[in-house]
């Protein structure tokens, strides 16, 4: 497992964080032998903004045919720079991650509204998703990002990508980080670990 210390907004807005992640992937491929990596099991993973970067990196790698990924693991990911969803309307405030906070995040990461429409910023806007690695999504129901996460899972399935989606009713954004407080958080972490084990045993 390699954790990428990518540079972050607002000091380093798009595309710098994504470039850092993709550079790390390329480095892993070029130095696989010395790092002891099995390239047949190379995957990307991330939660929230990290989920956005993981999904975007998978899109870029597939488009440029630079790196072949085994899978992508997206935990309550950001998949579109749009606030016009049922989840944003329903959970705009009072449920942890708020509409106002997400608007601020987007202003720091991608200030230009036109650039936000690009697929590497909003993976849900990708014109093609065929050929992407199988995807595993873990979504919190009471999360402003729930609808876009579900929509991305649907888009991938319709594009012929193998998808597994787990939805956790009543959970808030980032709930896996609070597994000490939520039984469902512990359950989700356990299920994620089992999914990882199963997926890579057959790789």
Which ranges hold each PLM region?
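Alpha/beta-hydrolase superfamily serine-hydrolase fold, recognizing
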Residues: 1-203
């Amino acid at each position: 497992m390699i954790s990428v210390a990518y540079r972050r907004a607002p000091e380093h807005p798009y595309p710098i964080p994504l470039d850092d992640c993709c550079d790390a992937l390329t480095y892993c491929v070029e130095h696989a032998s010395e790092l002891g990596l099995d390239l047949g099991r190379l995957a990307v993973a991330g939660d929230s903004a990290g989920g956005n970067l993981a999904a975007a990196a998978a899109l870029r790698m597939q488009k440029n045919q630079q790196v072949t990924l085994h899978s992508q693991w997206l935990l309550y990911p950001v998949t579109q720079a749009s606030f016009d969803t049922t989840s944003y309307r329903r959970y705009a405030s009072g449920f942890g991650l708020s509409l106002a906070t997400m608007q601020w995040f987007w202003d720091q990461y991608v200030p230009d509204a036109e650039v936000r429409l690009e697929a590497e910023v909003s993976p849900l806007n990708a014109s093609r998703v065929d050929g992407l690695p199988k995807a595993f999504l873990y979504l919190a129901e009471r999360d402003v990002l729930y609808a876009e996460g579900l929509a991305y899972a649907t888009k991938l399935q319709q594009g012929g990508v193998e998808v597994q989606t787990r939805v956790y009713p009543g959970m808030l954004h980032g709930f896996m980080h609070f597994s000490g407080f939520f039984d469902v958080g512990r359950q989700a972490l356990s299920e994620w670990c089992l999914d990882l084990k199963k997926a890579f045993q057959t790789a």
